Amino acid sequence: MYLIADWRRTHYSEEVIPEMDGQEVILMGWVHSIRALGKLAFVILRDREGTIQAVVPKQKVDEETFEIAKKLGKEDIIAIRGKVVANEKAPKGFEVIPIEIRVLNKADAPLPLDPSEKVPAEIDTRLDKRFLDIRRPKIQAIFKIRSEMLRSIRKTFADEGFIEVNTPKLVASATEGGTELFPISYFEKEAFLGQSPQLYKQMMMAGGFDKVFEIAQIFRAEEHNTRRHLNEAVSIDTEMSFVNEKDAMAMLEKVVYNCYADIEYNRPQEIELLELNWEVPEKTFDKVTYTEAIDIAISKGVEIEWGEDLSRAAERAVGDEMGGLYFITEWPTQTRPFYTLPHEKDAKVCKAFDLMYKELEISSGAQRVHKYDLLVENISNMGMNPDSFETYLEAFKFGMPPHAGWGLGADRFAMVLTAQDNIRECVLFPRDRQRLTP
């Protein structure tokens, strides 16, 4: 066994090219596969960026190096110092001839999961051994695209003058008056894990921040057991002052469009590896009102009445009709939280919107109520006690500007971008009703 000592990686696998013929490199990673054929051994080393072939001919390396190569096992951690040799017959037009191989750590055998993807495994097995599962190139591709998604979103917000904030995740009461909260013991009191940063975002509008965003965990104690829901999720939230719901939708369009464009430019290998049918959307998305969506659903045989939230069957019907990215706007006020602003011409309809991808809701937003009296009235009308929202409501007494915002589900958006049909594929260590480990 060797320590890393004075060695440091000089290149990732994808950085080595045939034009480096004769150059010495140091590579580090996992043994993806090993073949020993008499006086010749082939070692495929895998790192974060891909794989690279090292050829170990007995007549060209010292005896110790050849013996080390023959005894390597799958997923051993190794470092190779060697020379690049151009070879048109090699998989990438070159190979690496080791000068020295250091075994940094051995992997036990047999492996509980095959990172080479030759042996398929069910998702529960893969999640149980997630540290091995994420060694698979296709799984890494999902999370590289997710990482680029988040980088792009932060850049767009920064370019548009937004301030990044962090809001509490330990709260005293429900954000939206719901019961789907995880209670925890907080010294002598009961507290809850935050289900949304909504109230804090609005309080910051009273503070004069104008434009804020947050990317953070939210927690919802909903007993869903579907491919679209998790109990711990990452939400991308924003709030803007002196705007209406149309401005908020335009900002959401910009964020989503830039994600597609940036991923196309910066992650072409991952797009190819996942065999994605990649298409950057138009800069503005189609829009359909809630009433029009209901009409579409009914025309396709779905039983639903105006004023009901869209059922799964209705979402599928509308998604089949609309396809791709589109907004559903002008929702019934009764279906939305108390802080949603009713339409001035018809209070039964509010200035809310959902961004959909086919049948999947990925974002929800609205123009908010900014008048104190109306907010108190809405809270009471929904059967809640305004006193429970005292610190929130106080922000509306002393100069709250008109404002709007939205929340975008990072995990669901990653599902869309990577064409996965299970949200758990897009979360490193998902938390659902059954899963609390690893």
Curated annotation (Swiss-Prot):
Where, by residue number, does Mg(2+) 3 bind? E361
Q: Which reaction does it catalyse?
A: tRNA(Asx) + L-aspartate + ATP = L-aspartyl-tRNA(Asx) + AMP + diphosphate
Residue ranges annotated as coiled coil are none
Q: Which UniProt keywords apply?
A: Aminoacyl-tRNA synthetase, ATP-binding, Cytoplasm, Ligase, Magnesium, Metal-binding, Nucleotide-binding, Protein biosynthesis
Cofactor or coenzyme needed: Mg(2+)
Q: Where is this site: Important for tRNA non-discrimination?
A: P91
| Annotated stretches, region: Aspartate | 198-201
UniProt binding sites for ATP: R220, A221, E222, R228, H229, L230, E361, G409, A410, D411, R412
Please tell me where this protein is predominantly located. cytoplasm
Family matches, as Pfam families:
tRNA-synt_2, tRNA_anti-codon
Which parts of the sequence bind L-aspartate? E176, R220, S364, R368
**What assembly does the database describe for this protein?**
Homodimer.
Q: What is this protein called?
A: Aspartate--tRNA(Asp/Asn) ligase
